[in-house]
Curated annotation (Swiss-Prot):
GO biological process, one term: translation
Biased composition (Basic residues): 9-22
Protein name, UniProt field: Small ribosomal subunit protein uS11c
GO cellular component term of the entry, any: chloroplast
Pfam families the record matches: Ribosomal_S11
Protein keywords: Chloroplast, Plastid, Ribonucleoprotein, Ribosomal protein, RNA-binding, rRNA-binding
Assembly notes: Part of the 30S ribosomal subunit.
UniProt organism field: Nicotiana tabacum
UniProt region (Disordered), positions on chain: 1-22
PANTHER family for this protein: 40S RIBOSOMAL PROTEIN S14/30S RIBOSOMAL PROTEIN S11
UniProt-recorded Gene Ontology molecular function terms: rRNA binding; structural constituent of ribosome
Amino acid sequence: MAKAIPKISSRRNGRIGSRKGARRIPKGVIHVQASFNNTIVTVTDVRGRVVSWSSAGTSGFKGTRRGTPFAAQTAAANAIRTVVDQGMQRAEVMIKGPGLGRDAALRAIRRSGILLTFVRDVTPMPHNGCRPPKKRRV
């Protein structure tokens, strides 16, 4: 009769969830990318390593509702909730894009209790580069 192979648990040593410990991040950079169709909020440390991110799509909004200010506010709140738990107190904000979610995301960041050192608009502006797409006719 064959020997029974002992079952090896994937949760050895009682560890559940991620293997890395939660880092303490006192200062970070919050990147808000607001397009007309979606808003993406990424929180990084000062070296540029991503700590947390969220978007209007991952927050549960689909279709044209992703471009709304309320969706951007929800995405910003979701991204910041995890880093506040990791001890972030101060942050810089970089806002990129022409979308409706710019101001709503910034309001949600201000309301979270993180002290903002500065807010910078880093929207790429062409110095007469590529030809823009033709205007829509609806």
